[in-house]
């Protein structure tokens, strides 16, 4: 990371950081896509089971991992303020927090999986597959959260290409493991949807160990000597992380759990509808990787500039990121319109699932446009360490506006399952508007304060 003088330099540095993050996010998303697609080749029940399992796991993981993303603005601002010596302490305390979070998830899951699944109106076979999937993926919870800390540290230094390479290594590992455990090839047990969870867990162990080795041994990370000094657990330092991380985590949880809630509310529909909904949602999640990557990039560059008190530069980066995300969303909207039948065909061989997935994809087109505005703004606000408003916005727009609208339309009109998607679009649009005005206010406040 370095100071930039004009828009061209900013664009060059922004893209240098963004492109590896985008590839990394797409790669991580492809792990879930591979789970879904390959499970769907076994049976519709396996596809639906993985869909339900993912819907329960994803909001929990993304919300708790969101707490750990506080590492990024904290380290970025330390680097901008030239306080490199404080970085190792922050990273180690974050690893302690990651371990505590992992233990809490494992213990909670042990007691809650059965009651939650029993209260869902699921076909017996689908419920069994969902439980097996969750148990298997739980074996990789600890390394996944530790990897998140390592990734945030690496990315906050602007070295996003490193995490990109780690992710690219993980894809063939996950594909091969899926091939072995889902289908039972080469003498391995045929586990179906559960095999997808086991494959992902093993993959998480691999990327965690690789990242730890790189941080410990490779330039420029080893010069920080992250593991060179033993630091005991500090409640005070952990609270600094949690003060920033908890609002981020809950905001992400409210956003991702709304999609999970919709899937669960749709559980009374038939297996074809659930499978089609999940297939379309998986593809929409893949498209979301660009605005999410822009968001993560903005947290790094805005945090760096804010730490250095260059607030006009941080504002310029914010609008650059939003422009890139919106431009890409318009392009992907065109792709969906032209190739939705081919996209649907990637997810299912069943004719009924394919036809219904095509219709769901049209709704995905609209809410990814709102994501292109909301996600980058969230990233910019996190760079300023302004996280509480994002939390409130997520709660109101998704749960107080989006979900009720979706439930009413989905339950009491002829739109049926599509009504829930209309609710999602409404919530995302409301959130985007609220976040935009917040960003303007924060930017003006910092610039005005600096000019006094």
UniProtKB/Swiss-Prot annotation:
Cite the entry's keywords alphabetically.
Answer: Antiport, Cell membrane, Ion transport, Membrane, Transmembrane, Transmembrane helix, Transport
Transmembrane domains' residue ranges = 12-34, 49-71, 91-113, 128-150, 162-184, 194-216, 245-267, 282-304, 317-339, 359-381, 388-410, 415-437
Pfam families linked to this entry: MatE
Q: Name one GO cellular component term.
A: plasma membrane
| Matching InterPro entries | MATE_fam, MATE_MdtK, MdtK-like
Q: List where in the cell it is found.
A: Cell membrane
Gene Ontology terms: biological process: monoatomic ion transport
**Its topology with respect to the membrane?**
Multi-pass membrane protein
| Chain's role | Multidrug efflux pump.
**Family label:** Belongs to the multi antimicrobial extrusion (MATE) (TC 2.A.66.1) family.
Name of this protein: Probable multidrug resistance protein NorM
Q: Which organism is it from?
A: Bacillus licheniformis (strain ATCC 14580 / DSM 13 / JCM 2505 / CCUG 7422 / NBRC 12200 / NCIMB 9375 / NCTC 10341 / NRRL NRS-1264 / Gibson 46)
């Amino acid at each position: 990371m370095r100071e930039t003088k004009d828009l061209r330099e900013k664009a060059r540095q922004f893209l240098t950081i963004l492109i590896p993050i985008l590839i990394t996010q797409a790669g991580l998303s492809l792990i879930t896509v591979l789970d879904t697609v390959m499970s769907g080749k076994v049976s519709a029940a396996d596809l639906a089971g993985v869909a339900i399992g993912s819907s329960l796991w994803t909001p929990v993981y993304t919300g708790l991992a969101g707490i750990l993303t506080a590492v990024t603005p904290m380290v970025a601002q330390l680097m901008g303020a030239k306080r490199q010596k404080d970085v190792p302490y922050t990273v180690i305390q974050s690893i302690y927090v990651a371990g505590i979070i992992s233990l809490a998830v494992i213990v909670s899951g042990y007691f809650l999986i059965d009651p939650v699944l029993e209260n869902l109106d699921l076909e017996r076979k689908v419920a069994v597959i969902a439980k097996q999937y969750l148990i298997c993926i739980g074996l990789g919870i600890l390394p996944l959260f530790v990897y998140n800390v390592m990734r945030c540290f690496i990315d906050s230094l602007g070295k996003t290409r490193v995490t990109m390479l780690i992710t690219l290594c993980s894809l063939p590992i996950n594909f091969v493991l899926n091939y072995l455990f889902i289908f039972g090839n080469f003498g391995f047990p045929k586990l179906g949807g559960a095999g997808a969870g086991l494959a992902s867990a093993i993959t998480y162990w691999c990327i965690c160990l690789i990242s730890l080795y790189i941080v410990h041994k490779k330039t420029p990370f080893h010069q920080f000597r992250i593991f060179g000094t033993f630091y005991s657990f500090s409640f005070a330092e952990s609270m600094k992380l949690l003060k920033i991380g908890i609002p981020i985590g809950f905001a992400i949880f409210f956003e991702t759990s709304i999609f999970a809630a919709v899937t669960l509310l749709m559980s009374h529909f038939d297996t074809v509808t659930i499978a089609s909904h999940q297939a379309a949602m998986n593809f929409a999640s893949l498209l979301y990787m660009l605005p999410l990557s822009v968001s993560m990039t903005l947290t790094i560059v805005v945090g760096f500039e804010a730490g250095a008190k260059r607030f006009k530069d941080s504002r310029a980066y914010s609008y650059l990121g939003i422009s890139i995300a919106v431009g890409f969303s318009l392009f992907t909207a065109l792709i969906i319109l032209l190739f939705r039948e081919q996209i649907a065909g990637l997810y299912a061989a069943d004719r009924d699932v394919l036809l219904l997935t095509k219709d769901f994809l049209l709704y995905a087109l609209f809410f990814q446009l709102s994501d292109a505005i909301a996600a980058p703004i969230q990233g910019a606000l996190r760079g300023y360490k302004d996280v509480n408003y994002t939390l409130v916005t997520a709660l109101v727009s998704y749960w107080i506006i989006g979900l009720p609208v979706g439930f009413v339309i989905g339950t009491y009109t002829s739109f049926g399952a599509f009504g829930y998607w209309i609710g999602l679009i409404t919530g995302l649009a409301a959130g985007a508007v609220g976040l935009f005005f917040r960003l303007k206010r924060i930017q003006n406040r910092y610039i005005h304060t600096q000019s006094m």
